[in-house]
Amino acid sequence: MQNIMLRIAYDGTAFAGYQEQENCRTVAGVLRGAVETLTGRSTRLIAAGRTDAGVHAEDQVVNFLTHLDWPADAFLYQLRCLLPDDLLLRSAQVAIPSFHARFAPHKTTYRYVVENGSYVLPTERHTVFSYTFPLNDALILEAARRLEGTHQFAAFSVPDPYRNSQRTVDAVTIERQATRLILRFTADGFLHRQVRFMTGAILLAGRGAIDLCNLSAAL
């Protein structure tokens, strides 16, 4: 058996997230279908992380086991022919037998682009979020700083009684480019919708809608 590692990128607009769901178009479902068409066998995909509906990815790692003793390039070129335009196979390589995408050490970085001006171009409507309220840069930077570190993020995620809500956020950075804000969140992993909730909290703090002390108390 060969262990094949794939690096994928996708436009999440038409996907209901990464994880397979019944009667939904998902990244895992489309990718698994292509792999099974190629190999002729049922295949289990293992992913380094999962994205929510509408979330895009530039470099996500997936691996699977196969009986086919092909070189990596054969998987790369043939799978590319089977995938739709909104799902790209960036690379393929033969990994060591013990490699497991989910448990391999890695960092995940989410990027949110917020337009704080009067409009978003139609060509950017799936990748840029419009937020027209005036923002105080000092407040959003302080809010970002308070979200860094190890905290209980239950208030910043979808409730799940079976999952530990403690996470360590390595960095939250905010870059301003004129009326545009680029927020980046880096951690070993995130809870369901945690990054969306943190982004919302930062923006609310920036417009003075929530107090920074209340933000800290929620952690």
Question: Where do the protein language model's features map onto the residues?
Answer:
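Structured-RNA-binding interfaces characteristic of tRNA pseudouridine synthases
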Residues: 1-219
